[in-house]
Amino acid sequence: MKKKGIVLAMVLVMALTLTGCLFRSPEDLYRQPEKSAGYEKLNEAIRKVRTALELNYAAMVEDAGIVAGDNTASIQLQDLDGDGIRESAVTFLRVSGVTNPLKIVVFTQVGEEYEVTGMVEGEGNLVYSIEYRQINDTGRKELIVNWQISSGAYQLGVYTLDDLTLGDDGATRAVRSDSTQIDFSKLMGSELLLTWCSVASDGSNGARLTDIDQDTRTELAVIRVDSSGINSYVEVFGWRNGAMASLGTVNLSKGITELSRVRLNYLAGQPEPPALYITSTLANGGKAIDVVAWLNGKLTDLTLDESGISREILQGYTEVTPTDINGDYVLEIPTPNLLPSYGENLSNDFWLIDWCQYNKNGHRNHVMTTYHNVSDGWYLEIPENWRDQITISRNDQVTGQREVVFSRWLGEDEEPEPFLSIYRISSSQGNRVTENGWFLLREEENVIYAAQFRGSWDCGLNEQQLRDRVKSIQTSWYYD
């Protein structure tokens, strides 16, 4: 009886609690969440800076956008002093009609208030990208800013706030929290570097921060592509003897007219040296891939031949890009090879892709061969004994079904002998797998992949070995 009373009391308490939740007033239900005191203090500090800028320049002040990169928020919380606490807030403003309209303002939390503790400024209408990194080995992190001057024109700047005088509380003497008067001259960071750079057509930045010479210091690699195809190159800058200095340049492949994509990765070997994988567009629409690294004490393009043109050219088939195809964290470079065609397939091109990898000694090594079906989202690792033995065709005549047929090549005058079909069907058509005697490769959301061995040729694979070789194409390979 006592237990029943306890249970009844608990039920009553829960009912009363739920009543309090479910029968709140409409005003309470639709009320915006309360903002933290720190958020309000920061916004008040930003408003004061905007007001001071408007008074100083007699011009309108608005927010400035950040186009690309990992830091695109309008207000960015950062740990600039490297103590593990994000004590700084960075915001981006634009003042209309002045020489350097873009203003990047740094605030530091001092007690419960936010004080403005630094500013950098630049030309253009937008901040293309910004990064924060220790460049000069002391003080606060530097700001590495790519200013978008106009469409297709960019300036890369490196700025330090270390020359600003901070009080014991971490604030400058340029402004007090209760004042709208700001001496901006006391807030300006020092410009360590200002140079032009390219931006890739996929949106990736034409500059990369990395310890490219592996001396434990961060360097800045800047890519510049000449649209005339004559003089494209990479230049590396680093902090030496109290200043930013050019540490070396290296030419990129002749004939490139547009930067397509930049990836920072490694060369094979231990330790893995950093390398830039630079994909550019040629005047004829093909792609050239340059691999740039620090080798034997200097900046080197590992892919250039004696004529100054990259050995890694994608011509005719450009749907693949450098990819970590074998999962060892080092990018491989694709080389497409056109397969022979027969009959109705003469108008359709099918390719096998050889993947190679550059190591820390600059040597090029073959890793694997694949067939990539980009439209259907899968690829097949090709066994070595298939090389020079196969052709590929496609059959999309059945509604809701796509079939890729692998056949043994018997020569130009003989019809190829099919030995394997790989199917992509919708999940709603899953009954076709058993009805047709196929075997399942795998099932994804709304899609089933299946296969069937055909003919008499022993291709050297069983069902499980084929499953292990058919893999999904990761979209990040193409868009990261």
Regions found by a protein language model. Name each.
Residues Q148, S407-E412, Q452-W457:
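Secondary-structure transition/turn motif
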Residues R408-Q429:
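A short acidic-to-branched-hydrophobic micro-motif
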Residues M1-K2, F107:
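Generic N-terminal leader/processing signal
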Residues E444-E463:
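Domain-scale activation on soluble regions of proteins
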Residues C21-R394, V398, E403-V404, Q429-R432, ...:
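Beta-propeller-forming repeat regions
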Residues K2-P26:
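Sec-dependent N-terminal signal peptides of Gram-positive bacterial secreted proteins and lipoproteins
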